[in-house]
Design a protein with these regions (language model features):
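Residue-level detector of secondary-structure boundary/capping sites
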Residues: 3, 74, 116, 174-175
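N-terminal helix-rich structural modules
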Residues: 22-150, 157
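An amphipathic alpha-helical core segment
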Residues: 126-190
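A cross-kingdom marker for long, charged
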Residues: 179-208
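A C-terminal-region feature
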Residues: 22-32, 158-164, 173, 196, ...
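Bacterial Sec-dependent N-terminal signal peptides
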Residues: 1-25
Length: 208
C-alpha cells in the first residue's frame, strides 16, 4: 500500500517555552533572535496553510501541489540552516527569550527536517522537557516522527498517514495502543479519538 506521511502543521498557539538560557553578553541579541524566528515561523507555516486549498482545487497529485511542495522544501532547507545555527550557538531558546512564536519556530523547523537532524536535536529537546523548559506535547510529536523513521511504532499516535490509493487518512502503528491515551494525557495531548477527527478518521481504542 502506498502511503505518505502527513506533515502535521496544526499550531494551536499553546506551545510553551523550550529554553536553555543564553550568555549574559548575548542578552541584547534577544530582539534580533526573536525577529529572526518570527520570520522563520511565518515562512514555515504560510505555504503549508495553502495545501488544503490547493488539494481541493487541483488534487493531491497535481502539478500545482508538486510545485507547492517544491517551494516548501526549499523554504525548509533555508530555515533549517538558520535554526540549527541558533540551536548550536544558544541552545533551545524559550519563550522568555524569543517569544512563544519564536520558540514554536524552533520546534517546527526540526519537526519538518530530515531524520538525521531530528535525531541530533531530540536529546536537546528531551533535556528541555526534563528541566521544565518545554512542553511534553511538542516532544511527543518529535518522538513519534523519529520512531516511525527508525522503523518502530509511534508512542503517542500523533502521526497520521494517508493511503494514496483511497485518499483516506489513518493512524500510523502505535506501540501498546490500548494505553495510548494514558501516555497522551501525561504530556497534555487530547484523547486520540478526538485528535483524529481533524482527518475524519473513525477511530476506536482497542480493548485491553
Amino acid at each position: 500500500m502506498k502511503e505518505t506521511t502527513l506533515i502535521l502543521c496544526l499550531i494551536t498557539g499553546t506551545f510553551l517555552a523550550i529554553g536553555q538560557g543564553i550568555p549574559k553578553q548575548k542578552i541584547e541579541s534577544n530582539k534580533n533572535l526573536t525577529n529572526q524566528l518570527d520570520s522563520i515561523y511565518i515562512e514555515d507555516q504560510k505555504y503549508r496553510e495553502m495545501m488544503g486549498d490547493v488539494e481541493a482545487k487541483h488534487g493531491m497529485e497535481s502539478k500545482e501541489m508538486k510545485d507547492l511542495w517544491n517551494t516548501i522544501n526549499k523554504k525548509d532547507a533555508i530555515n533549517l540552516v538558520r535554526v540549527t545555527k541558533i540551536l548550536d550557538t544558544y541552545g533551545w531558546l524559550g519563550a522568555d527569550v524569543v517569544g512563544e512564536r519564536g520558540n514554536s519556530a524552533l520546534f517546527l523547523v526540526i519537526q519538518h527536517s530530515n531524520q538525521t537532524t531530528q535525531e541530533k536535536y531530540l536529546p536537546m529537546m528531551r533535556d528541555a522537557v526534563k528541566n521544565g523548559k518545554a512542553q511534553g506535547s511538542q516532544l511527543a510529536l518529535l518522538e513519534d516522527r523519529v520512531a516511525l523513521a527508525q522503523g518502530k511504532k509511534q508512542i503517542y499516535g500523533s502521526q497520521i498517514h494517508r493511503d494514496m490509493q483511497t485518499g483516506k487518512y489513518f493512524v500510523a502503528p502505535i506501540e501498546d495502543e490500548a494505553n495510548v491515551n494514558k501516555r497522551r494525557a501525561s504530556v497534555g495531548l487530547e484523547p486520540l479519538e478526538e485528535y483524529v477527527q481533524h482527518w475524519n478518521i473513525d477511530y476506536k481504542l482497542p480493548a485491553k
